[in-house]
Amino acid sequence: AVGYRSCYDEGKRCAETLFMDYHRQNNVRVKIIRIFNTYGPRMLPNDGRVVSNFILQALNNEDITIYGDGKQTRSFQYIDDLIEGMIRMMNTEDEFTGPINLGNPNEFPVLELAERIISMTGSSSKIVFKSLPDDDPKQRQPDITLAKEKLGWQPTVELEEGLKRMIEYFKNCLLYTSDAA
């Protein structure tokens, strides 16, 4: 079925096809990695992703918006884990092109993520629920079996530790922004 997200999904599929065609025609070394929900320092505070949105809202004691009931799950991968996986993928034999999934298979309900961030920031934010868009997936969890087999890779940074680092980074961003004003 063609839904609101179809262009996003098809764009990624099309890009993989173009890379493989270019690889076959020009004998160029290609590696295809499918990246799942990555977060970490140096993210733009206003990039619109759930982790950065929740942290900024919590640090500013603003309401945290959850679409749906918050039971939908997401898997969050810390940037250091992604980089390690990418380096390992680049170092595989030329014949192995992928695709390979790099992500954290541990799922967290969106509501639990919001509650955890509020707790970790000491925020007075309240959680506000809004209607869930029709195209929003109820679950996103990567299968990293191939990454484990081919790369000897799996994520090592736990969500709690990654959030701690992100919160500290965003606190510094907010301090810098308010000092510059």
Q: Where in this protein do the model-derived segments appear?
A:
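Hydrophobic "lid"/C-terminal helical patch
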Residues: 86-90, 114-117, 163-170
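C-terminal "lid/loop" region of Rossmann-like NAD(P)-dependent oxidoreductases
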Residues: 69-71, 97-100, 108-115, 122-139, ...
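Conserved small/polar residues in nucleotide/adenosyl-binding loops
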Residues: 176-181
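Catalytic helix-loop patch of NAD(P)-dependent Rossmann-fold dehydrogenases
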Residues: 1-32, 43-47
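Non-catalytic, hydrophobic alpha-helical segments
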Residues: 82, 102, 113, 147, ...
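A conserved structural motif in NAD(P)-dependent oxidoreductases
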Residues: 77-81, 158
